[in-house]
């Protein structure tokens, strides 16, 4: 991908995502406090905690697709992640799970107690290019490129889905089509390599 095409991709993707997530997540307003975080104490396998680095965030097309999003495991326990991701009843994702819908945003499941208000998920705002990934912001409270708080959208997911927004999980639908999301995913400018 040429540098010019990569720049155009970043600008267009950021603009589309900004508008979509801003509308879908209530225009940046605070979420209702009625949805408690899911419990991870009894169903989450006890895998070691992780300290995600930029190198952990790879081209989406090298990750495992589940529905509209992509998943991976920073601990090497992809089968445990997939068991939860494919369950119609949901479940608690294991420590080290990585979930991404688009190249510029990610969430990683951290150790129990990391952030009870986010179900122990760490959110990431990423800058992607043909050279790879840079972490722009990370933590329990992350303002992404459009200025919205990641957790405010994900808190709306039904408790059994452990903060992961999927079709019929309780999150607000995105005001962009599945085709647009698929195009953004397919045009991930990062190098394709095995994860």
Outline where the language-model segments fall.
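Bacterial signal peptide processing site
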Residues: 26-29
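N-terminal leader/targeting signatures
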Residues: 17-18, 43
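C-terminal motif of bacterial Sec signal peptides marking the signal peptidase cleavage site
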Residues: 22-24
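Sequence context surrounding c-type heme c attachment/ligation sites in exported
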Residues: 31, 36-38, 44-47, 65-66, ...
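N-terminal secretory signal peptides
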Residues: 37-95
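Bacterial N-terminal signal peptides that target proteins for export
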Residues: 2-14
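Intrinsically disordered, low-complexity regions enriched in Ser/Pro/Gly/Gln/His and often acidic
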Residues: 2, 18, 114-116
């Amino acid at each position: 991908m040429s540098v010019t095409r990569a720049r155009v991709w970043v600008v267009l993707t950021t603009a589309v995502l900004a508008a979509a997530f801003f509308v879908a997540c209530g225009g940046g307003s605070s979420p209702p406090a009625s949805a408690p975080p899911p419990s991870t104490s009894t169903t989450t396998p006890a895998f070691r905690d992780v300290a995600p680095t930029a190198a952990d965030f790879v081209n989406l097309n090298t990750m495992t697709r589940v529905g509209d999003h992509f998943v991976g495991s920073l601990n090497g326990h992809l089968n445990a992640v997939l068991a939860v991701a494919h369950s119609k009843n949901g479940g608690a994702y294991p420590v080290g799970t990585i979930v991404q819908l688009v190249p510029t945003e990610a969430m990683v499941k951290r150790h129990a107690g990391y952030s009870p208000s986010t179900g122990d998920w760490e959110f990431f705002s990423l800058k992607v290019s043909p050279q790879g990934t840079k972490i722009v912001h990370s933590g329990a409270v992350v303002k992404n490129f459009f200025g919205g708080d990641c957790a405010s959208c994900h808190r709306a997911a039904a408790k059994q889905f452990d903060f992961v927004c999927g079709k019929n999980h309780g999150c607000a639908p995105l005001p962009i089509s599945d085709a647009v999301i698929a195009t953004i995913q397919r045009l991930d400018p990062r190098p394709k390599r095995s994860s």
